[in-house]
């Protein structure tokens, strides 16, 4: 047990950091506005065109501690004018500034961790597509998979306790506790039994959510790494990139401190793989379902007894990869069994050898994508293209450029699809919707307007990869078509298109 004691000890080097005085610094709110916001709520209110001062912030914090923070003095006309437009205005102001402040210990921790590990500062691992080559390489050798929705409708006090390991300033923690209890209902939005963050306060709650996720993953991945026979250094660097200002090895809090070696033996599996995305996680293993069940109940106990998040074990299904398809970041993942029969002739005897190989497939589900196009008024619910209403002063080139940008973004994101039929249909919908929009603007028929545009208009909807491959292999058309039909993963995609994010 002594050899693992270093993993359990939290870093005490920054216990004397006091973050509370930073709340009264004006540049903190300017920093939050410049880096985290598209628009400043401070400049949208009549009668207030200056930056938030320390006096304003002090008044806001004072009202948080009061029983009725919405009662203002009748003589304070400037405050009534400032606060009257949005009763949650000052909660947004403080949340924006507080989010910047509490990120400071994590950012300092990240910089020191990178300097200590001397990890390569590559941006490729931040790409969404960086996970697909990993899945393509691993999933074809695995047998069982389980997709789980991570519960994060947690108690407010658990959020504060999670930050206690990082933020040692008691005043800041007390302010956060009062702030969350007072404005919890206005900062979150219930939707289909899932709590999502309000668009007005995304930074603070994304930070709190990631801190909560990193807390449980530190325990989970620590047991996984210690019990594995194969320690991969590349996976450590990978997790540095996707985690939120944190290094996995830097803080670990294990529930089961008694008989630790038995716990490690209990979870021993060199082929257990873990992937997290969009509030969900994937567990995949090569072993029998028994080991998957062990990890399943470990996660349930961890969430229920450590984070006080209610979760039913029956909601975690364990499926065979060869019989199960998984919706993952706009793709539908599956492992298909390809069987081939080989005839072998040895002297006078012949044998038939049946070889079965697993192939990892990534398919673009067309029905959800058509639903997203329908909501954006590019087509109806059946997938028939329709004209999109446009502004009267929009030029033809602006309309065409908008459709081309959407088409190329979708094609760029779904370039890893093993079957391109869905992409061809999406291109057809966007191309014909563009023609109908232009024809509606000029009050002409679609056929007449399409003749006017000519074949050059259709060529503009070719994606970049099609154009590049056609230039490189212009003499061998079959080669370029075969390469384009293959899977292409780009390492510069850092966000999901709105039309793709249909989950």
Curated annotation (Swiss-Prot):
Pfam families according to UniProt: Intron_maturas2, MatK_N
Q: Cellular location of this protein?
A: Plastid, Chloroplast
Is RNA-binding included in the keywords of this UniProt record? yes
Q: Extract one GO molecular function annotation from the record.
A: RNA binding
Q: Which GO terms describe its cellular component?
A: chloroplast
Which UniProt keywords are given for this protein, alphabetically ordered? Chloroplast, mRNA processing, Plastid, RNA-binding, tRNA processing
Origin: domain of life? Eukaryota
Q: Name one GO biological process term.
A: RNA splicing
In terms of InterPro entries, this protein maps to: Domain_X, Maturase_MatK, Maturase_MatK_N
Primary location class = plastid
| Function, as annotated | Usually encoded in the trnK tRNA gene intron. Probably assists in splicing its own and other chloroplast group II introns.
Family listed:
Belongs to the intron maturase 2 family. MatK subfamily.
* Protein's name according to its UniProt entry: Maturase K
Q: Which organism is it from?
A: Callistemon polandii (Gold-tipped bottlebrush)
Q: Highest lineage ranks of the organism?
A: Eukaryota, Viridiplantae, Streptophyta, Embryophyta, Tracheophyta
């Amino acid at each position: 047990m002594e050899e693992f004691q270093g993993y359990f000890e939290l870093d005490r080097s920054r216990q004397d950091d006091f973050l509370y005085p930073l709340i009264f610094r004006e540049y903190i709110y300017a920093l939050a506005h410049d880096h985290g916001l598209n628009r400043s709520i401070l400049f949208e209110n009549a009668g207030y065109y200056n930056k938030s001062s320390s006096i304003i912030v002090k008044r806001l914090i004072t009202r948080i501690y009061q029983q009725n923070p919405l009662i203002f003095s009748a003589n304070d006309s400037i405050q009534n004018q400032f606060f009257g437009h949005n009763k949650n205005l000052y909660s947004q102001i403080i949340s924006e500034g507080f989010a910047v402040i509490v990120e400071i210990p994590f950012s300092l921790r990240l910089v020191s961790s990178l300097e200590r590990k001397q990890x390569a500062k590559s941006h490729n691992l931040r790409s969404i597509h960086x996970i697909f080559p990993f899945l393509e390489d691993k999933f074809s050798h695995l047998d069982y998979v389980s997709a789980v929705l991570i519960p994060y409708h947690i108690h407010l006090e658990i959020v504060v306790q999670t930050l206690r390991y990082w933020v040692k300033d008691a005043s800041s923690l007390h302010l956060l506790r009062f702030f969350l209890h007072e404005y919890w209902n206005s900062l979150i939005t219930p939707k289909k039994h899932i709590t999502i963050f309000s668009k007005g306060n995304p930074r603070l709650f994304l930070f709190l959510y990631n801190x909560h996720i990193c807390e449980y993953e530190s325990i989970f991945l620590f047991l996984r790494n210690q019990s594995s026979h194969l320690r991969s250094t590349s996976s450590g660097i990978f997790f540095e990139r996707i985690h939120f200002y944190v290094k996995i090895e830097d803080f670990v809090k294990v529930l089961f401190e008694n008989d630790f070696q038995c716990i490690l033996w209990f979870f021993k599996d060199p082929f257990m793989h873990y992937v997290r995305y969009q509030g969900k996680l994937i567990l995949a293993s090569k072993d029998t379902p028994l080991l998957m069940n062990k990890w399943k109940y470990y996660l349930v106990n961890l969430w229920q007894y450590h984070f006080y998040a209610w979760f039913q074990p029956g909601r975690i299904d364990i499926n065979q990869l060869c019989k199960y398809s998984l919706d993952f970041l706009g793709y539908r993942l599956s492992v298909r069994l390809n069987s081939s029969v080989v005839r072998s002739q040895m002297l006078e005897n012949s044998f038939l050898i049946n070889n079965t190989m697993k192939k990892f497939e990534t398919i673009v589900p067309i029905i959800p994508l058509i639903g997203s196009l329908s909501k954006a008024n590019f087509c109806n619910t059946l997938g028939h293209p329709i004209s999109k209403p446009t502004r009267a002063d929009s030029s033809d080139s602006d309309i065409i450029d908008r459709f081309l940008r959407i088409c190329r973004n979708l094609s760029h994101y779904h370039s890893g699809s093993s079957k391109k039929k869905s992409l061809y249909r999406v291109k057809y919908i966007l191309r014909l919707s563009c023609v109908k929009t232009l024809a509606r603007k000029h009050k002409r028929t679609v056929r007449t307007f399409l003749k006017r545009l000519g074949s050059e208009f259709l060529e503009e909807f070719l994606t970049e990869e099609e154009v590049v491959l056609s230039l490189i292999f212009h003499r061998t058309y079959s080669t370029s078509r075969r390469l384009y039909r293959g899977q292409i993963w780009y390492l510069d995609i850092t966000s999901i298109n709105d039309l793709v994010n249909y989950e």
